[in-house]
């Protein structure tokens, strides 16, 4: 890309391609969001109950909670360690990876549960992730001192396999999502089934439209943002001023940085903000 400026900051992405006309005359902007409903791991999540280890969670965005039980789940995220290093974590996506799960009642014990409304048949507090059932073995001294041996086994696994201490959960951002790749759906392969199409399908097309644009008359911009699922709040949501700041930085790099020109550039811009819509389903 000629004369391009891109910036990625964790959960947002902004890319500009300077046009032939001055930035003050406005931009053509493509926008989409890259967050999706999910389950987040809390900051002090690991606990043991009845010889089973769990991760305490809360859900992000609008989810049908009953859809998340008894399906293979993967964990994605980052851990910021005490020494300042940041480690990416993905467990559950490779064929030989273990997956996680949220348990549910078997049908023979569900008489009262199935009488509940769909919104409460699985409570938000019941979305904790089952991560282990085997107690720690091979350490006689620790086995005598430790009352929660399954939790201790998980802590040992984290240390040996991820070089992670239990305290590192405090500075971690870990997300639970359905495990598995997107796949063709239907005998005619006319559909795609996969997690996160709202709204990454629009983010994908917006990004590639930007990458395939050459020598635009007006400055082109692609902005992919976070927090849409919870109202666009926070430092990386559209309620913040980060986009205006990026435009001001670009104006300072290419022209004189006059604040009035920044406001003119925004006022003269056009934006296509894209998101998914619901398909017609005759069954409903």
Q: Predicted regions span which residues?
A:
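Single conserved hydrophobic/aromatic residue that forms the stacking wall/gate
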Residues: 1-5, 9
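Short glycine-aspartate micro-motif
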Residues: 27-31, 222, 269-273
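Acidic, glycine-rich active-site loops and adjacent beta-strand->loop/helix elements
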Residues: 34-36, 61-63, 81-83, 180-182, ...
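Soluble metallo-hydrolase cores and metallopeptidase-like ectodomains found primarily
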Residues: 10-15, 20-24, 93-194, 212
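A generic, well-ordered mixed alpha/beta core segment in the N-terminal half of proteins
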Residues: 22-113, 118, 129
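Flexible, glycine/charged-enriched surface loops at secondary-structure junctions
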Residues: 163-173, 216-222, 255-268
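Metal-dependent peptidase/peptidase-like ectodomains
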Residues: 113-155, 231-284
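Alpha-helical metal-binding/catalytic segments enriched in His/Glu/Asp
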Residues: 32, 55-60, 193-233, 245-246
């Amino acid at each position: 890309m000629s004369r391009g400026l891109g910036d990625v900051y964790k959960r947002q992405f902004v890319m500009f391609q300077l046009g032939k006309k001055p930035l003050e005359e406005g931009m053509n902007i493509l926008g989409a969001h890259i967050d999706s409903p999910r389950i987040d791991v809390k900051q002090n999540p690991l606990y043991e109950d009845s010889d089973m280890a769990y991760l305490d969670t809360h859900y992000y965005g609008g989810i049908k909670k009953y859809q998340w039980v008894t399906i293979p789940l993967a964990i994605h995220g980052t851990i910021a360690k005490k020494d300042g290093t940041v480690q990416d974590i993905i467990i559950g996506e490779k064929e030989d990876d273990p997956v996680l799960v949220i348990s549910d009642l078997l049908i023979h014990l569900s008489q009262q549960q199935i009488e509940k409304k769909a919104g409460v048949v699985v409570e938000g507090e019941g979305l904790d992730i089952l991560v282990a059932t085997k107690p720690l073995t091979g350490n006689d001294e620790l086995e005598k001192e430790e009352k929660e041996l399954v939790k201790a086994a998980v802590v040992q696994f984290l240390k040996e396999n991820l070089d992670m201490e239990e305290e590192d959960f405090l500075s971690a951002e870990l997300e639970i999502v359905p495990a598995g790749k997107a796949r063709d759906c239907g005998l005619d392969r006319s559909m795609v089934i996969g997690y996160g199409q709202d709204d990454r399908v629009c983010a994908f097309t917006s990004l590639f439209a930007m990458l395939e644009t050459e020598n635009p008359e007006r400055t082109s911009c692609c902005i992919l943002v976070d927090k849409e699922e919870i109202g666009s709040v926070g430092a990386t949501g559209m309620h913040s001023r980060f986009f205006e700041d990026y435009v001001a930085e670009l104006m300072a790099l290419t022209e004189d940085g006059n604040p009035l020109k920044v406001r003119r550039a925004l006022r003269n811009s056009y934006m296509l903000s894209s998101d998914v819509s619901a398909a017609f389903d005759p069954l409903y």
